[in-house]
Amino acid sequence: MTTILGLTCISEQLKDKDKKKYSFRTMTRKRFNDLCVRDGRDEAIKELSERIAHNLYVTQYILRHCHSNDIRHYRLSSSLFPLLTDQTLELAYTDLPNHKRLDTELRFIGIIAKTFGISLGSHPDQFVVLASANKNAVKNSINELNFHASIFEKIGLPQDHTAPMNIHVNRSIKDGETLEDIAEIFYSNLMKCNAGVRSRLTIENEDKLSLFNIDDCIKFSEYLFETHNYNLPVCADNLHHLCNPSEVLNFAWQAERCAYTWVNQGEGEHNFIAPVFHWSEGKPEKPRAHADYIAFGNFPPYIAIDPDKPAKWEVEVKAKCKAVKLLQEQMAGAI
């Protein structure tokens, strides 16, 4: 498979030029509530809306930077819209005084990405747990996913896995449970999500030993397809595989198995969807934590599928686009 390198969320190169201009801005619940007390709720919402507008401008800058550096996939930051899915605050997108302007900026993000041939995806909050036994956790998860999908619609992204929304199953198999039991809970709650979620959702293997490894994810995906005719592609993460290995340790072989779950829109060559995978390395002293850069020798893994078919690799290291640039140079030198 050919290799497409992807950037995740932040551009360290842009931040080196102007940290304030190119950094995403967030807002904590405490900060919002303090503003409400000091200046009133309307003023607090106004400040929040301006921070969100800034985040959309930063995203546009990053997409242009991706184009200039031949990066053809980008994972949108999950922090673009702070607090809007915090149900305790009772905030809605349309409460933002500049929401129509934000609609325009989101459409422009889509235009930039389409013009430059950059695919987009996301990785919603790690606390999204569709298979949870906690009803409130499920409610919050559905709300989070539906919101992400609504933003994808405003951007103008296709309702398929070329614009993946990637999550973890985030459940261990407890005594008396089976993987199939968890799959049924997951599927039942997924069907409560809107069509934009259902058509884009993917899952990835996890880094904790008690949670889903690649084998579990593939079995999970196969069960949903065979039982409900629902396709759930699997994103392979190499660092998570090292921390929480499957029976077969060879990651390239496991990634190949995952790649076949992305052929999901019917029969025929034209229905192949390029898989989106994750590549990272851990710190020697803390293996589950992302290192700054990637050692080129192990990347990209050889996946024995048609060499003309692409695989997208979101590079998950602290140096972000600096690491992508270095990988590009190393790969070019190896040809």
Where are these regions (language model features)?
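Alpha/beta catalytic barrel-like cores
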Residues: M1-S119, V128-L157, H161, I182, ...
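A generic structural signal for short coil/turn motifs at secondary-structure boundaries
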Residues: L130-A131, K174-E177, C243-S246
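Short, well-ordered beta-to-alpha junction loops that form the rim of enzyme active sites
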Residues: S77-F81, P124-D125, N170, N205-E206
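Positively charged, amphipathic and often flexible ligand-engagement surfaces
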Residues: K208, C235, L239-C243, V276-G282
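Eukaryote-skewed repeat-based solenoidal scaffolds used as protein-protein interaction platforms
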Residues: K139, L145-V234, L239
